[in-house]
């Protein structure tokens, strides 16, 4: 078995000798560092396997949309049946076919375990995995936290987007923002063996036009040098009246390889400007959820804006020390500058839909460094094969958030059915400075023990995670005491897999995730007490079925996440609160009867508050989450016209509660999408035409949102693209 690097690229064998498993060069983790999963040959008996292709993508299901392998953190890439987790990898073909403009578009299209609101104009990507919020700032870039764009990431520079469901601190270390529902890894494009030059022109209603150029080449006597460039520009009006968006991206990927070493570098620069952004609405207690207005209504002033700029870079290296030992290391840095002027809080205050508005602005600057070093080795002890991994991760963020607010223009009195807003106002009553300096360091070890050529596999692992956190608050020039936290903890994992046959695997795991601890506030009897990183604990069992062109994953899970809790009797603050999510998932993807491709599934998640400061909410369902999601995407390649593929998709979400007492809720919805794809040849050049009409019935519906309780779902949106290969 060969474990691959997260980028799915293998070094080319030039001499005819067996290719050694790649290993990253040990990069000193001094001031900053950064990391990625790497590949190594699992056992020396495989040493005669010569790999002669570099940069070739893994085999894929669903007509090339779903990779048969995905990155599993420090364990490297694993094939579908060898992965003891519920994981999925989306290829660049899926990204293109989905007309995706961010990561949420990719991972939520047909996966029922992932929930996104569907609203437009939010300043950041927002999604939930297995019922828990996952912060876009916790997305990994080639295995490193903190390198990807901070608020939104254009997906055109990625070869693959991997999603691993459930907490995974052993595999990746503690996410900077404490996401525990799952982890996402963005794998950048590399130059392939064959040169690539393609241009994609895009249109999205009402009048947003754009282009994407993708160029890749290899150079040198043995094609040891690789260059891949991606450039993106989009600008124009969105499908919501009064809302527009402009996005730019330039990314460059470089690599060099020989028989035993690999060096890769990535650089990118991206910007986004949204005019008429939308943070959503809250609703006053006792007010019924009103009927939604027209689907293209902008519930925010058109003069409001979000403006962000991201830049990042990383270098990684791998070196084969022997046939069975690989060393790896990576280092990266990124910076985000964000500026916003938008209503911070908009509340529905009566049954007629009247809005109460508080304005505010935000300026944010975030600088991040990240890294990883490690060693992977394979060896045998009698009949047992070992795959041993040691690694250390590092992450630091220096952030300054400068919000303003509390300007309440009461004379406006907008209404959701007639949202008339006053002129732009930047005179605010309150000014804040919220600096944060956070450093996270971890050391992890994992040993995968295999018997009978991998039929029986058990992975035992442990990670030590430390965090050094300091934050401050300045309000209208008045400084408040600094909050300091310096704590550490251990997170174990036990994972097992049994390959029943060449097409069936059973797996189970116990894993933990970490969220930053806090200090007890001024209202607590134990004010100032610091708490270590808090552990979210998962137990999971599942079955995987590989029917060559069609795959299924069935899983059962329970996740318990601690929440802040202040004892009503003693007034002592702790993390004694708890949310418990229990769920069952069925996901499938593949080709059926040659002409049909199916992707989708069903997920039921019972998210219950089991202990809370307000005891009346115990036993209630967690808010802003449908307990049932069902998704199905069908593609039909017409037998009478093989160049044409017709596409249909349906997404169902059940009722969602938006208040802790479960008295206010949003009704269940089913959204339908239609599309088509046509392969043509023009002037001897391949041209692929893609058409999508999302929310084809133009359903007006409420959905939940990251910052507030509810927001309008996206209206009917038409997207068209044409990709020409030169």
Swiss-Prot record:
Effect listed in the UniProt record for changing residue 585 to A: Loss of activity
Signal sequence coordinates: 1-35
MF GO annotations: siderophore uptake transmembrane transporter activity; signaling receptor activity
Chain positions of motif TonB C-terminal box: 709-726
Effect noted on mutating residue 463 to A/E: Loss of activity
Assigned protein family: Belongs to the TonB-dependent receptor family.
Subunit description: Part of an iron transport system composed of the outer membrane receptor FatA, the periplasmic binding protein FatB and the inner membrane proteins FatC and FatD. Energy for the transport is provided by the TonB2 system.
UniProt name for this protein: Ferric-anguibactin receptor FatA
Organism, as annotated: Vibrio anguillarum (strain ATCC 68554 / 775)
């Amino acid at each position: 078995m060969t474990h691959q690097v997260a980028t799915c690229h293998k070094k080319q064998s030039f001499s005819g000798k067996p290719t050694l498993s790649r290993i990253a060069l040990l990069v000193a983790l001094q001031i900053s560092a950064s990391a990625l999963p790497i590949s190594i040959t699992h056992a020396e008996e495989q040493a005669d396997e010569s790999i002669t292709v570099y940069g070739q993508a893994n085999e894929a299901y669903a007509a090339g949309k779903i990779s048969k392998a995905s990155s599993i953190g420090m364990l490297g890439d694993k094939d579908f049946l060898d992965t003891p987790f519920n994981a999925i990898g989306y290829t660049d073909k899926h990204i293109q076919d989905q007309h995706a403009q961010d990561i949420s578009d990719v991972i939520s299209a047909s996966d029922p375990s992932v929930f996104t609101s569907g609203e437009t104009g939010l300043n950041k990507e927002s999604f939930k995995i297995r019922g828990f919020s996952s912060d876009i700032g916790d997305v990994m870039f080639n295995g490193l936290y903190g390198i990807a764009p901070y608020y939104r990431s254009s997906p055109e520079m990625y070869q693959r987007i991997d999603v691993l469901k459930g907490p995974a601190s052993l595999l990746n270390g503690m996410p900077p923002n404490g996401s525990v529902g799952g982890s996402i890894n963005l794998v950048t494009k590399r130059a392939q063996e064959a040169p690539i030059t393609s241009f994609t022109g895009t249109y999205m209603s009402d009048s947003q036009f754009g282009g994407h150029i993708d160029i890749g080449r290899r150079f040198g006597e043995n094609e040891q040098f690789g260059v891949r460039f991606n450039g993106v520009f989009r600008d124009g009006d969105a499908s919501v009246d009064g809302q527009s968006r402009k996005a730019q991206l330039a990314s460059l990927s470089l690599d060099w390889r020989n028989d035993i070493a690999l060096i890769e570098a990535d650089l990118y620069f991206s910007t986004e400007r949204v005019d008429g952004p939308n943070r959503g609405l809250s609703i006053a207690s006792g007010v019924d959820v009103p009927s939604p207005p027209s689907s293209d209504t902008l519930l925010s002033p058109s003069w409001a804006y979000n403006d962000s700029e991201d830049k990042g870079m990383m270098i990684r290296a791998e070196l084969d020390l022997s046939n069975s030992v690989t060393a790896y290391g990576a280092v990266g840095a990124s910076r985000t500058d964000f500026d916003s002027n938008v209503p911070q809080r908009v509340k529905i205050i009566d049954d007629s839909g009247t809005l109460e508005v508080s304005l505010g602005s935000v300026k944010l600057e975030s600088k991040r460094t990240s890294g990883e070093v490690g060693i992977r080795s394979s060896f045998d002890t009698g009949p047992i094969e070992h795959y041993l991994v040691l690694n250390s991760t590092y992450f630091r963020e220096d952030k300054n958030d400068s919000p303003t607010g509390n300007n309440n223009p009461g004379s406006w009195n907008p209404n959701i059915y007639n949202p008339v807003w006053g002129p732009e106002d930047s005179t605010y009553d309150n000014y804040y400075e919220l600096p944060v300096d956070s450093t996270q360091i971890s050391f992890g070890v994992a040993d995968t023990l295999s018997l009978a050529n991998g039929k029986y596999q058990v992975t035992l692992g442990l990670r030590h995670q430390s965090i050094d956190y300091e934050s401050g608050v300045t309000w209208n020039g008045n400084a408040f005491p600094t909050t300091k936290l310096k704590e550490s903890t251990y997170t174990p994992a036990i994972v097992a897999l049994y390959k029943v046959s060449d097409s069936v695997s059973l797996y189970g795991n116990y894993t933990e995730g970490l969220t930053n601890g806090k200090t007890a506030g001024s209202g607590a009897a134990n004010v100032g007490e610091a708490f270590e990183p808090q552990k979210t604990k998962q137990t999971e069992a599942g079955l995987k079925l590989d029917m060559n062109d069609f795959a299924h994953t069935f899983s059962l899970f329970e996740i318990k996440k601690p929440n802040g809790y202040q004892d009503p009797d003693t007034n002592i603050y702790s993390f004694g609160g708890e949310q418990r999510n229990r769920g069952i998932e069925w996901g499938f993807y593949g080709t059926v009867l040659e002409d049909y491709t199916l992707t989708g599934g069903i997920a039921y998640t019972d998210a219950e508050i089991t202990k809370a400061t307000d005891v009346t909410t115990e036993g209630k369902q967690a808010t802003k989450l449908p307990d049932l999601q069902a998704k199905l995407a069908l593609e039909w390649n017409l037998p009478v016209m093989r160049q044409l593929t017709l596409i249909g998709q349906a997404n169902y979400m059940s009722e969602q509660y938006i208040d802790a007492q479960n008295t206010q809720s949003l009704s269940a919805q089913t959204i339908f999408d239609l599309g088509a794809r046509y392969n043509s040849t023009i002037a001897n050049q391949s041209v692929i035409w893609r058409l999508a009409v999302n929310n084809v019935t133009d359903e007006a519906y409420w959905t939940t949102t990251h910052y507030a309780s509810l927001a309008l779902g996206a209206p009917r949106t038409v997207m068209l693209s044409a990709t020409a290969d030169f």
